[in-house]
Amino acid sequence: MSELTALTIAEARDKLKAKAITATELTDAYLSAIDSANETINAYVKVTHDQARSMAKASDERIAKGEAGALEGIPLGVKDLFATKGVHTQACSHILDGFKPEYESTVTANLWADGAVMLGKLNMDEFAMGSSNETSYYGSVKNPWRANGSNADLVPGGSSGGSAAAVAAQLCAGATATDTGGSIRQPAAFTGTVGIKPTYGRVSRWGTVAFASSLDQAGPIARDVRDAAILLKSMASLDLKDTTSVDLPIPDYEAAIGKSLKGMKIGIPKEYRVDGMPDEIEELWQKGIQYLKDAGAEIIDISLPNTKYALPAYYIVAPAEASSNLARYDGVRYGLRVPGKDIADMYEQTRAAGFGKEVKRRIMIGTYVLSAGYYDAYYLRAQKVRTLIKKDFEDVFAKGVHAILTPATPSAAFGLADEDLANDPVKMYLNDIFTVTVNMAGLPGIAVPAGINDKGLPLGLQLIGRPFEEETLFQAAHAIEQAAGRFTPAKWW
């Protein structure tokens, strides 16, 4: 970790503006950090050395001319789910072997238009399906954090594990990520970073490989709350190519940071106290409540009665949409093609060889719940539950609550290749217990580091906001960050 790679986005932006450093120096520092660490951490599946250097050179020229954009010269990593023109985009799946898009996703196009530099594509769970970044065709990502005195590798969380690990290990200044049921917030909590899932419709989905279209939303993972605010401002936009994109002004999120919490009402939902929740998570939650109280917020006990149905409903809705979205991968136009006796056999062979175990599992669940005779019993009921979950939140917000504080995850990061979890998918799915409600209701949610456990691992809290009121989340998350401090892993890689 060099002095340059230790800079936050806000610090690097100021130094670039003052011409104390150049974009080329900053980019080279990150590229050399990646080259020395990536073999161990496995955060990147493709490093774009030449492109990064030419983008940095162009940034330096714009800075010299006084034409710097909001992210001029800031080196970022891009989750492998975002289409990047002419650059490896495979959703970390074998079935998309060799795919290089002819177009740029709206999110990445917005970032490059603001002057950001692309370092490369980040590892992730295959098609964003996973909570540990162990389902990637390119192998598992290692969490830069380790327990005190231990050499055991831990997962970085998922599906945006590469994004979170790269940010925590200082292998990029910030990263793009996506969240369908917790894939930004859970890895952020596991790696001591900040991750925000914006309101559904705030950020365009165009050019992002689809998992579950009614739940997917892109957002940033960053080192601190201010950096997350800076990135979201650039990522968000109205996009007529995405029918769910919302035509609302994009606030200056950074301006919300440091504002007083006086008069802010924070709800504490009793239903989030789940059986078997470790003491350290309960203690962290109490600590977070105190931090917000000390910052001037009013704490209110609330009820979200349908919370317990969120996880089973999510694991019906998301696989159903995935089975439909992933039907397009058949080996005909692009990606992997395995020859067969006839066209139907070719489809079958290609999909059998191209998809990993977890993706196949979810496609099968999705196809089953959508099939005749089961559609009403499963899919329709899950959608009704989803409406009830949304109504729970609406009722609470209607009573004047501005944001809701909950744990982000039911534990700290767990071990890599945990056989117990590998053999029991339901146990693995329980990692999403605190995060899926936010996607089901289309709300914004942020994960912010709030403490370190006895083993020296980071723990995160989650704040859930009203639709399109991300500023409130940045404001409250910053208060927690100020009280808890920032956490960086000790370098072992």
Swiss-Prot record:
A GO CC term attached to the entry: glutamyl-tRNA(Gln) amidotransferase complex
Keyword ATP-binding included in the entry's annotation: yes
EC number of the protein: 6.3.5.7
GO BP term, example: translation
Enzyme class: ligase
Entry annotation: catalytic residues: 79 (charge relay system), 159 (charge relay system), 183 (acyl-ester intermediate)
SUPFAM superfamilies documented for this protein: Amidase signature (AS) enzymes
Molecular function terms, GO-annotated: ATP binding; glutaminyl-tRNA synthase (glutamine-hydrolyzing) activity
HAMAP family given in the database record: GatA (MF_00120)
Subunit structure: Heterotrimer of A, B and C subunits.
Described purpose of this protein according to its UniProt entry: Allows the formation of correctly charged Gln-tRNA(Gln) through the transamidation of misacylated Glu-tRNA(Gln) in organisms which lack glutaminyl-tRNA synthetase. The reaction takes place in the presence of glutamine and ATP through an activated gamma-phospho-Glu-tRNA(Gln).
This protein's name: Glutamyl-tRNA(Gln) amidotransferase subunit A
Organism in which the protein naturally occurs: Brucella anthropi (strain ATCC 49188 / DSM 6882 / CCUG 24695 / JCM 21032 / LMG 3331 / NBRC 15819 / NCTC 12168 / Alc 37)
Gene designation per UniProt: gatA
